Amino acid sequence: MHIHILGICGTFMGGLAALAREKGHEVTGCDTGVYPPMSDQLRALGIELVQGYGADQLAIAPDIFVVGNVVSRALTADGSPRYPLMEAILDAGVPYTSGPQWLAEHVLQGRHVLAVAGTHGKTTTTAMLAWILEAAGMQPGFLVGGVPMNFDLSARLGSMAPGACFVIEADEYDTAFFDKRSKFVHYRPRTLVLNNLEFDHADIFDDLPAIERQFHHLLRTVPGKGPHGSGRVVVNGLEESLARVLHAGCWSEVRSFGAAMSDYTAQGEPERFQVLLRGEPVGQVSWPLTGNHNQLNALAAIAAAEHVGVSPAAAAQALGRFQNVRRRMEVRGRVALRGTTGSEASVTVYDDFAHHPTAIRTTLDGLRRKLGPQARILALFEPRSNTMKLGAVKAQLPWSLEQADLVFCHAGGLGWNAREALIPLGTKADVADSIEELLRQVMAAARPGDHIVCMSNGGFGGIHLKLLADLQTWREPTPNRATPS
């Protein structure tokens, strides 16, 4: 089969392309923007990419077009179609489908699907779960919205034996312009992790109850008792929104984690903790990851893995070798700077995918906990997600950035006033309308020993490499801005 993927450079569609290629299908695709790590993966697979969505791609004549949810029937300012290829597909009456539907029909059928859903932590928890099963010798397939460093790829088929495990990141975003259901309703999981739930995706959801309804639609697809064993729902016991989802109706076995009375709890610091099952120690995790959020992610992954026969002790031991996911507090580089006093210390540049206030706060809280109160943290963020661009959560930004010593916001193209939104942060916040201006602001403020965290769900204009290059020629400027006490 030859498939041509529209929107191939998205994390989900890029992973789907990798799976299709591994199954022996011919894969081509098109998109308008390419950035690592997905671009690296596609090039390594030898998948031919076409720039843009020109109607002439109809001549490629694949067996089916697989349409990503980036594609719409929207028009440009001059009234022409924004996606001419999609219009040509519709006019010609040739076969097309959505990514989630193709995945369900060609990859997931006959597999034990373990799905990880939630507003935050999906990618990391999915990667943890896949690694636990891999360490147990189960050769799971997986599709992750990032690149787990234990595997160095975002998707693989894994064992194709009947009932073999497939771990998938289950996104609540809509499937396609012609199928407005959440992607995850296509996956039919037997094991479902519900990590957390708050308002997001303001471009397609009106409010939190609208998202809760989609999560309940997902819950309805998990089996109860059956010939192949019960389905299981692993749920964060700290989340009121998830409690409401379960209260609306649940037909499966439930295992909770996180809260004091949950089935799975943790005792100890996030970097080294005991795993308790109903109060009894069943394993210990010791790893370099930081933050309470990763402790919760670990409990969720352990509870899900236990459903397919991996003991909590074995799962906890495997997590000790977990290497995280690219763009989750990934260190992109360190540059040694020498100040006027002669002291020398490295500036560390991090890359993180945080793009929602809760995720931003979680990221910075974890780093502050690791570094201590004396370290200087410079937070650079780009309000790039649709929810951020609409300003739906802008009031939470000052709260999310409290742990940073200095804050730099790339506000180019926003429909709301970022300077006004960040007023509660006082003089420690700067706003720039371009990447170049942002770089100048950061370089003027940088000092030996700083930790610079770049947060975006996109490429952020390649700011990480630009920063590292500029830091190589850094000279300490005349002080013009003090870190607030």
Residue positions per predicted region:
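Switch II of P-loop NTPase G domains
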Residues: 174-188, 357-369
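ATP-dependent carboxylate-amine ligase
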Residues: 1-50, 61, 91, 216, ...
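Short gly/ser/thr-rich secondary-structure transition/capping motifs
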Residues: 44-51, 95-101, 144-151, 170-178, ...
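Acidic, Mg2+-coordinating active-site environments of NTP-dependent enzymes
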Residues: 39-43, 57-67, 73-97, 104, ...
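Walker A (P-loop) phosphate-binding motif
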Residues: 5, 19, 99-148
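Switch II (G3) loop of P-loop NTPases
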Residues: 165-175, 349-355
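Short glycine/serine/threonine-rich phosphate/pyrophosphate-binding segments
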Residues: 11-16, 122-128, 150-152, 175-179, ...
